[in-house]
Structures are given as C-alpha cells and as structure tokens.
C-alpha cells in the first residue's frame, strides 16, 4: 500500500512545470524535454499571462525568461514573491541576458537558480529535480 511519502515521490516525477518564454520554439523544446522526463507542462508567452496562469495552474516550478513582453521577468518574479499563494514556487531563470548583474539581481528577486541560454540540458534537469525536492514537504530527503 502506498504511503504518503511514496505518493509524494511519485508526484514529483509528474510535477507540473510552467515555462514562461516569448520564443515558441524554445517553449516547445523545453516542453518536449520535460515531458520526456515525466513532467507535466503549461506555458505562457508573456509576463501578464504568466501570473494569471500561475494563479490558475499552481505549478510546482516555473522556468522564466527575463526578456518578456507585457511585464519582464523581474516584474514576474516580484509579483510571484508578493503573492502568498505563489511565493513558495521555485523559479529557475533561463535567459539570453548576460549573467553579470542579471544573475545576482534574479537571485535577489527570489529566483532559485539562473541559467544563460543555451543551458546544458542535464544540468538544468538536475537543478529542476533538486528544486522540486527542496520545495516538497519532505525536503532533500527524497530519493533521486
């Protein structure tokens, strides 16, 4: 009989991840990569729809570009942090912007991690897994 702990482990492998990027090709590539690793995905193409979708879907993790129309990534991070319902969602910034200055600003604004495009697929997946485990009720004690 499954326990609460094993149910939680199983749910992490099917966790819903929200992709926020204005590039449709990148959204599709990330969606395919994440689904191949048993994650569910939803996506938004701008800052305004990102907040609305996060409120509706309650993803377990958000992958966020900084250069977005209708509200840049920093404004999205700020709004997520200001929301009691959304502030605990880990956010991984994935952007074409230079790390110098942007990485520190992103982390200070509440991001969990920062990647410059193109990101290493394996490293990104590793950070996604670690972020989901840290955000789970069981913390880092979950098996990988």
Predicted feature descriptions by range:
Residues 46-49, 60, 72-78:
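Acidic catalytic/metal-coordinating carboxylates
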Residues 57-63, 68:
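Active-site beta3 strand of CheY-like receiver
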Residues 28-36:
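Charged docking surfaces used in two-component/phosphorelay signaling
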Residues 1-16, 122-144:
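Non-catalytic signal-transmission and effector/linker regions of two-component phosphorelay proteins
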Residues 38-45, 53:
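Short hydrophobic/Thr-rich beta-strand motif most characteristic of the beta2 strand and flanking loop
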Residues 75, 98-115, 122-126:
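Alpha4 helix (beta4-alpha4-beta5 surface) of REC/receiver domains from two-component response regulators
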Residues 27, 69, 87, 99:
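The feature encodes the CheY-like receiver
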């Amino acid at each position: 009989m499954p326990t609460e702990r094993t149910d939680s482990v199983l749910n992490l492998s099917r966790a819903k991840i929200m992709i926020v990027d204005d590039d449709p090709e990148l959204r599709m590539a990330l969606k395919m990569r994440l689904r191949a690793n048993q994650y569910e995905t939803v996506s938004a193409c701008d800052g305004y729809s990102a907040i609305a979708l996060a409120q509706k879907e309650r993803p377990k993790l958000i992958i966020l570009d900084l250069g977005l129309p209708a509200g840049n990534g920093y404004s999205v991070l700020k709004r997520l942090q200001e929301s009691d319902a959304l502030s605990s969602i880990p956010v991984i910034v994935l952007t074409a912007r230079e790390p110098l200055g942007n990485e520190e600003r992103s982390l200070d604004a509440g991001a969990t991690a920062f990647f410059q495009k193109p990101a290493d697929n394996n490293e990104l997946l590793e950070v996604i897994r670690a972020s989901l485990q840290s955000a789970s009720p069981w913390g880092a004690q979950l098996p990988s």
